[in-house]
Amino acid sequence: MHADNWANKAKQMGYRTRAVFKLEEILNKIKPKKKYKNVLDIGSAPGGWSQFIKKKYRNTNVYALDILDMEPVDGVNFYKDSIENIDNIFEINKLKGAFNLVISDIAPNLSGIGAIDIENIFELNQMTINVAKNYLNSDGIMIMKTFQNNMLKTLRKEMEISFKVVQTFKPVASKKQSGEIYLFGVK
């Protein structure tokens, strides 16, 4: 299906973004054995992933974080702040070690200068991994967007230190020409 078709399908289903189909595909592939009580959505704007999680797992507590504004999603606790300040957000910090799922579709604003963009992406990915290590419970799951670049192997090795399982996914809903991929880890 073409990217525009995914966007149209998302709109028809009431979702804010086609990225929901990327998350749905990854969750279907990993077939989680449990329900998610607490979910942390990092880089949540415009809110499609939070919206999808809340719709699929109605009794889940969803905590969303982004530096950008996000229109409210029913039942989602949104915090306009940086991932760097997550430990200062009381409602999230009190659940340290109690999240079943950390999802991150976060990406920096791209400059067009490859070396700078790769470094910025890598830095955000490292912060996401650190948050997941600290906030996930045992057997918790992390799903994180990254990009195919020369830092991917380093990123995977870093994840393998703290996660029992590490896998890479390229969802069908991702644009074919995009270097975007997703890393999945089980703590």
What positions do the PLM features span?
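Conserved beta-strand signature within the Rossmann-like core of class I S-adenosyl-L-methionine
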Residues: D139-T146
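Class I SAM-dependent methyltransferase Rossmann-like catalytic core
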Residues: M1-K34
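Conserved class I S-adenosyl-L-methionine
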Residues: K35-A45
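Class I S-adenosyl-L-methionine
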Residues: T146-K187
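S-adenosyl-L-methionine
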Residues: I67-S111
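Conserved SAM-binding loop of SAM-dependent methyltransferases across substrates and taxa
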Residues: P46-R58
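Conserved SAM-binding motif I beta-strand of class I
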Residues: N61-D66
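Mobile active-site "lid"/loop adjacent to the S-adenosyl-L-methionine
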Residues: G97-N137
